[in-house]
């Protein structure tokens, strides 16, 4: 009887547990690098229309990444402005633009080339080429 009475609360509990709320700075500091980059790509950090978006969250993540990875002040400004440039690291591209729509991986004597596509096939698109986890090319165009 008790199970049946409270069964309607279960979806609410699960939703609250799954929702990506911004983490406090001390929790960000404890994340490993991959989890911190994933957090930079999260809706709470990237999407103003997200219910739990906090405008101060993305700068806190970028600050933590910059400290750990030794980013130059100019690079921090570019990532904060959502810019990607030739020479940017994989982490800087992800923190600036988030996860790509699709990826292509090619291995050759030169190393592993990755082409990250941002944007859907029917609208504006950008392509970021990474070699050895560094941006070597950024191409954008409208369709």
Give the label of every model feature segment:
Residues 19-143:
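Residues within mature, well-folded domains
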Residues 15-17:
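C-terminal motif of bacterial Sec signal peptides marking the signal peptidase cleavage site
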Residues 3-12:
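Sec-dependent signal peptide recognition
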